[in-house]
Amino acid sequence: MATENGAVELGIQSLSTDEASKGAASEESLAAEKDPAPPDPEKGPGPSDTKQDPDPSTPKKDANTPAPEKGDVVPAQPSAGGSQGPAGEGGQVEAPAEGSAGKPAALPQQTATAEASEKKPEAEKGPSGHQDPGEPTVGKKVAEGQAAARRGSPAFLHSPSCPAIIASTEKLPAQKPLSEASELIFEGVPATPGPTEPGPAKAEGGVDLLAESQKEAGEKAPGQADQAKVQGDTSRGIEFQAVPSERPRPEVGQALCLPAREEDCFQILDDCPPPPAPFPHRIVELRTGNVSSEFSMNSKEALGGGKFGAVCTCTEKSTGLKLAAKVIKKQTPKDKEMVMLEIEVMNQLNHRNLIQLYAAIETPHEIVLFMEYIEGGELFERIVDEDYHLTEVDTMVFVRQICDGILFMHKMRVLHLDLKPENILCVNTTGHLVKIIDFGLARRYNPNEKLKVNFGTPEFLSPEVVNYDQISDKTDMWSLGVITYMLLSGLSPFLGDDDTETLNNVLSGNWYFDEETFEAVSDEAKDFVSNLIVKEQGARMSAAQCLAHPWLNNLAEKAKRCNRRLKSQILLKKYLMKRRWKKNFIAVSAANRFKKISSSGALMALGV
């Protein structure tokens, strides 16, 4: 609305300042839109037609007309020969200056003042070149078009959780333009085809307000126009969203928008580090005490047993913590020596895939080791369950965790020397998390010193143990290869009718991939096993090399393709029914072994 002193409100210039002409302003504007003929001179002073006056005099500045401030854009005056169409569509409009005599000054159309430029940079031209207060309908549509132009939501993104949508809905502070942001981060979002959103409304005359607004904004802020050009560039199928670095990224939404990550598939398979023990790692020392005063023993809930004693559950009275108690009988001084060695080894093993020691108490007749309680049971007992669907990817998850635990042991210069399926427990009855237990036969390892042992379980013994040769960290890797073979096939590669035949099979390296059983097993899995069950220690893979093997990598991609159930699940069930390792730790006389295997060392099969 134009005031009496000529000031312009809302950035729109009024062409008439006379009080008498205000009443006819709306009628003239509507008539100008419908009929481009020049106004009737009898109605009073008004704008002159450029066709009738092709050589207007130089416009004179009015004292009351505010001069454009620095930074405002003043359009150049078009020449008479360049005028096209009626007034308001490229021609000049003249109006008498209030309080001045002589010929009225020619005012450039749509010349905004500094105040109007700051308030309304998106002001649009109507079809007649001006907006009169008598046209509320057109003004309302212009305001709606300006609001739509400011929103400018991308057309290709429709997911409410997509980070680009989140960014577009969060308006930036008006007092801090985009060009003043300290740093911009462009987030790439795949442009997926979808239904096109309706564009902003158009004003009368078919002028696209959004296009005009972007054009005017580009003239005022070239930097913003360049950024808008980058935003709209979808030539490569990627739309970029400019986001100030001060606002944190919505990482959760981004994970929903992007393709599934590898760890997402791990979560489905419970392939994440097992939960730590319910107590922090501690350095345990053997002490004398009264077990019943500190712990409530539950001997009826047996977890296992062997030659040295039994394992049951217990509860610490002061904290209510449930633990596993390994009771070892002190029959000879060597029994205590072996327990002290086990405590020393476990004090160094602080890893999620290795069982943790809580306390050790000595009584007159026995030693009790209190350890982390693992409720899932043995790995093989778990996978033979009829409700469990075993796939090769499941085996990869199990083997990878075993390799993680072995790698940590070997870094700490510890050899387990009794890796077998019953010494691998599941953390729970539903997931894929496992831990290695039973360090009763573990030994400290120094590569510069020779170490020989003559104990173990025949099926999982390496040739160097059977021959009583020097062992190394590769001795554990042989056992890992046998375990992997059994998980994939359900068969034991060296198992014979008796222990003697089993040990002969180990020494001769007499094993192969059963064609029918391994039909559905990948070549990568076979290669993994073939590089572990090798007679020469130096030719076997280390734990680090196993973790880098292709078979134990790219699990997410393999999980998408793997939907076949392994036959080993059925064969393992038959195997466990035939042979229970818990009751088959047999002490073997060296003299009986020498008769058939021609070995230079004695062999004993011990277990706890």
UniProtKB/Swiss-Prot annotation:
Q: What name is this protein filed under?
A: Myosin light chain kinase 2, skeletal/cardiac muscle
UniProt lists the family membership as follows: Belongs to the protein kinase superfamily. CAMK Ser/Thr protein kinase family.
Residue spans with biased composition (Gly residues)? 82-91
User: Its Gene Ontology molecular function terms?
Assistant: ATP binding; calcium/calmodulin-dependent protein kinase activity; calmodulin binding; myosin light chain kinase activity
Per the record, its GO cellular-component terms are: cytoplasm
- What residues bind ATP, as annotated? L303, G304, G305, G306, K307, F308, G309, A310, V311, K326
**Keyword check for Cell division:** no
Modification Phosphothreonine occurs at: T457
Q: Return the annotated region ranges for Disordered.
A: 1-160, 214-235
The annotated subunit structure for this chain is:
May interact with centrin.
Q: Which residues carry this modification: Phosphoserine?
A: S153, S159, S161
What SMART domains does the record point to? S_TKc
The UniProt keyword set, sorted, is: Acetylation, ATP-binding, Calmodulin-binding, Cytoplasm, Kinase, Nucleotide-binding, Phosphoprotein, Serine/threonine-protein kinase, Transferase
Reaction catalyzed: L-seryl-[myosin light chain] + ATP = O-phospho-L-seryl-[myosin light chain] + ADP + H(+); L-threonyl-[myosin light chain] + ATP = O-phospho-L-threonyl-[myosin light chain] + ADP + H(+)
Positions with biased composition (Basic and acidic residues): 31-43, 50-63, 116-127
A matching Pfam family: Pkinase
